[in-house]
Amino acid sequence: MITPQEALQRTIEHREIFHDEMLHLMRLIMRGDMSPVMAAAIITGLRVKKETIGEITAAATVMREFARHVDVQDNSNFVDIVGTGGDGSHTFNISTATMFVSAAAGAKVAKHGNRGVSSKSGSADVLEALGVNIDLQPEQVAASITETGMGFMFAPNHHPAMKNIAPVRRELGVRTIFNILGPLTNPAGAPNQLQGVFHPDLVGIQVRVMQRLGARHVLVVYGRDGMDEVSLGAATLVGELRNGEITEYEIHPEDFGMQMVSNRTLKVADAAESKVLLLEALDNKPGVAREIVTLNAGTALYSANVAESIADGIRLAREAIASGKARAKVDELVRFTQQFKH
């Protein structure tokens, strides 16, 4: 089998690491059997040569192997709403707000997230600010999804093996393959996904990785203004996997009768500010926050196969917000998760 030194040499020569070799190297890293120096060198080398679809697929396969899984029996209309983060836009937690709206409209949502790394407020931070207990065991998350239609998986609880590479990632301080693996390794194995990415090149890459990993209906999105969400401020690049086929296209707010507006007003300094915007959107307060959540929830409902199109999803999302159902989902998740407080 390939040695870490051989793998490093290969990245230096800009040559690909093959599937079985990548599986082997990732297992060494996840088990803590590779020295921090070699692990740092290899993940940096991969970034410099640019990770291939095959390398990312193999790495995601191993991360899934090492994860603590959430077993959800019925996976119809089951969707993961996630962003790679790292888009540097510092907006409020649009994907977290999207989770509540999507669940209110009939999807089951497994949200996989963490505390803010590059953002001022990660999904875990804003959920805690809302009063949600994010520290659940896998079977409690499964119960949460079954009962409320929503489950939040706090990444450190589900990827314990990541602690072996965490110090290396922290010290390097640059983006590595691990930044794009998070969205590919949902511990509940949701077959459908709305995935936001921080770079246009990742749209085509991530949708093909999800195809290889056996996903059902995936929309990978990149807002041309740099957002890892469906954007109101620019066109959004979409890579869609459906029935095994991939199509790539662009969507615009105007396609759905929405106005193009800058995302500037969506910027927040911390989780408390993010909570305010999130609740304003769910309380049906007219404004950019409500519109961008509606647009993203419409897209998520389409990927969850609750809606027949994004336009149909937007209609359902508007209903879920206007009826007060989306706002009620926040209290429901708070109540359900608080019963597990130790």
Curated annotation (Swiss-Prot):
GO terms for biological process: L-tryptophan biosynthetic process. Its EC number is 2.4.2.18. Gene3D superfamilies: Nucleoside phosphorylase/phosphoribosyltransferase catalytic domain, Transferase, Pyrimidine Nucleoside Phosphorylase, Chain C. GO terms for molecular function: anthranilate phosphoribosyltransferase activity; magnesium ion binding. Mg(2+) 2 binds at D228, E229. 5-phospho-alpha-D-ribose 1-diphosphate binds at residues 83, 86-87, 91, 93-96, 111-119, 123. Anthranilate 2 binds at R169. Binds 2 magnesium ions per monomer. Its cofactor is Mg(2+). Mg(2+) 1 binds at S95, E229. It holds the Pfam family Glycos_trans_3N. Pathway: Amino-acid biosynthesis; L-tryptophan biosynthesis; L-tryptophan from chorismate: step 2/5. Anthranilate 1 binds at G83, N114. It catalyses: N-(5-phospho-beta-D-ribosyl)anthranilate + diphosphate = 5-phospho-alpha-D-ribose 1-diphosphate + anthranilate. It is an enzyme of class 2 (transferase). GO terms for cellular component: cytosol. Keywords: Amino-acid biosynthesis, Aromatic amino acid biosynthesis, Glycosyltransferase, Magnesium, Metal-binding, Transferase, Tryptophan biosynthesis. Catalyzes the transfer of the phosphoribosyl group of 5-phosphorylribose-1-pyrophosphate (PRPP) to anthranilate to yield N-(5'-phosphoribosyl)-anthranilate (PRA). Belongs to the anthranilate phosphoribosyltransferase family. Homodimer. This is Anthranilate phosphoribosyltransferase. It comes from Paraburkholderia phymatum (strain DSM 17167 / CIP 108236 / LMG 21445 / STM815) (Burkholderia phymatum).
